[in-house]
Amino acid sequence: MKKCRITVMKVARYDDLIEKYENPIQHACDMKEGQVFIANGWERPEGFCLSAWESMSAFVLTLSHGGGDFYDGWMKNKKSAMISCNDGFRPVSFLIEALDENAE
């Protein structure tokens, strides 16, 4: 099983939607563009958002086991995926890449 690098590529915030539809929350997303996490196979990286992990864990698991080429040629690099979390108010886009390094 291989490790995967997860890089925060884009962080968006839709204040108009937040103001109109969201109840106030105590802790909003604190991901920063350029932030990098290493997934040790199927394990969620320490400090990584649980909701974002639930959106991407199947892709990480597939890549860590040598799979890829999602959706018949979707990504230029077949050992990668571009996934966003499911927060419609503050979506974050992540690049997931399989590494050559084995998971522990």
Mark where each language-model region is:
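Intrinsically disordered, low-complexity acidic/polar segments
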Residues: 15-17, 48, 103
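Beta-strand elements of well-folded, non-transmembrane domains
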Residues: 10-12, 100
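Ser/Thr- (and often Asn-) enriched beta-sheet segments in non-cytosolic proteins
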Residues: 3-7, 36-38, 93-97
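Short, Lys/Arg- and Gly-enriched loop/turn segments at beta-strand edges
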Residues: 44-55
